[in-house]
């Protein structure tokens, strides 16, 4: 996403009450570069709001088998040492976590999922179940459509307005890496934040 598209996306969520609850998970995604399974697997014990640190040491994986196993979640640990890491939190990311906590408190939502001994997940749906990539991408597609429809209705296609492109959760990880590159961040630092063992 460009800077303008990224701003449009987050402004849209904040200005539309029915979508504001999605803001924290997507904001954290776009401002930490974490993989979607790392985000959905985050527990409150994995973050330190005082020190401003996110500890990444596991991934939540959703299996959709078309056999007797059916659909289920599992926890995986990183394949490489680089995958296990600490990510510094910006003030915006910290506020997103606090926003999520406040939203859940007001809506009387709490994590009810237990996966391979892991519980107290941060990002859960209204039933207290962990989120999965399919549901997050579905929410993205709907918000892209609604946002673009609203802009085109207001300004018309001839005005060449900023619109949201088609994108997925994984694109938010790329967007984070792009913003780091644009800021002149050291490649080794980018590699460590993203959890890559080798530079591409």
Map each language-model feature to its residues.
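A short, basic/aromatic helix-end/turn motif that makes direct DNA contacts
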Residues: 41-47, 191-197
């Amino acid at each position: 996403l460009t800077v303008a598209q990224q701003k449009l996306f987050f402004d849209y969520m904040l200005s539309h009450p029915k979508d504001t609850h999605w803001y924290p998970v997507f904001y954290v995604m776009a401002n930490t570069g974490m993989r979607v399974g790392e985000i959905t697997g985050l527990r409150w014990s994995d973050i330190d709001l005082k020190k401003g640190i996110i500890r990444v040491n596991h991934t939540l994986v959703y299996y959709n088998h078309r056999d007797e196993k059916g659909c289920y979640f599992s926890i995986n640990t990183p394949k490489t040492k680089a995958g296990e890491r600490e990510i510094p939190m910006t003030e915006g990311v910290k506020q997103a976590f606090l926003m999520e906590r406040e939203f859940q408190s007001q809506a009387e939502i709490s994590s009810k999922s237990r996966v391979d001994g892991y519980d107290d997940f941060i990002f859960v749906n209204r039933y207290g179940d962990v989120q999965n990539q399919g549901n997050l991408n579905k929410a993205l597609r709907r918000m892209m459509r609604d946002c673009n429809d609203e802009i085109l209705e207001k300004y018309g296609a001839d005005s060449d307005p900023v619109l949201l492109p088609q994108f997925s959760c994984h694109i938010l990880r790329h967007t984070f890496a792009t913003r780091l590159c644009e800021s002149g961040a050291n490649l080794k630092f980018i590699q460590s934040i993203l959890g890559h063992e080798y530079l591409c």
